[in-house]
Amino acid sequence: MGKVRLALTAVLGATSLVALGATGGAAGASSTSALAACKKSVPAHEYVKGQLTVATDSPAYTPWFVNNTPSNGKGYESAVAYAIAGELGVPRDKVHWVVEPFDSSYVPGVKKFDFDINEISYTAARAKAVTFSTSYYDVTQSIVALKTNPIVKKHSPAELKTYLYGDQLGTTGLAYINDHIKPTRTPRVYSTLDQAVAELQTHQIDAIVVDTPDGQYMASAQIQNAKHKSIATQVGQFPSTGEHFGLLFQKGNPLVGCVNTAIAALKANGTLKALQAKYLGIYNRVPVIKP
């Protein structure tokens, strides 16, 4: 639901690293000394002293979370949050989860959390109001439709333009529809993704464009008939446009420097790759279509 990045990260990273007493850029921040410095400095900047306050939306969907329980450490984003906490020296029982609706997460103002992890894509517009970490997942967009819809078999670039799409306000799925598919009919916009799904199920729209992992879940488990059989399919995913997820912080939060240090360490030691293989590996097999 969302992701130029390099320049912004360099500026924010430099500011944050100075504030926290860490050293180096994203590449050098994975060193033992940088993490050691972060473990000492992070507590002074926690939203609630003595704990790391992490936000996400409710409900929290698979595969990012499992059983709508962020605190169980299961699902990609839950596991990543705890892995970051571990790199920063925060014990598991000192990670506290709070609810932050997706649509309000990237509006300007005071945030009542240390960071938000909620499939939030970095965009230049959002970065004017909040601060993002470096990427913890590079994401593609995909089409979800009912199995009976013509788009399942007819999705050439020209054909894609003829369908009526629907999506949640402010998502990168909606942006992809408008910027890349460029349909002849104005997409319908909803305040929640569940509303778009309901419209899809009742044939009010032809398709939804969402992050590929979300699309797989929607098609296989969320959109079902009365007999609990899937009635939707993931038509395919689009080529990457460089979209990526970042942790979201209040604008200028000095914690971002050390979180970037932790993310770099998790990339270097293979933790992120292993978690992606565990929770997100299936999505690499979704066929690629070109708009």
What feature does the model see in each segment?
Residues 104, 120-129, 178-179, 206-241:
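A ligand-binding cleft/hinge motif common to bilobed small-molecule-binding domains
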Residues 58, 138-145, 223-261, 282-291:
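Periplasmic-binding protein-like
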Residues 1-29:
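Secretory targeting and sorting signals
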Residues 93-157:
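Acidic, polar ligand-binding/catalytic clefts
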Residues 59, 73-87, 120-124, 139-197, ...:
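Bilobed "Venus flytrap"/periplasmic-binding protein-like clamshell domains
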Residues 29-43, 172-188, 227-229, 261-291:
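Ligand-binding clefts/hinges and TM-proximal coupling segments of bilobed small-molecule sensing domains
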Residues 78, 87, 149, 171, ...:
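Extended ligand-binding regions for polar small-molecule ligands
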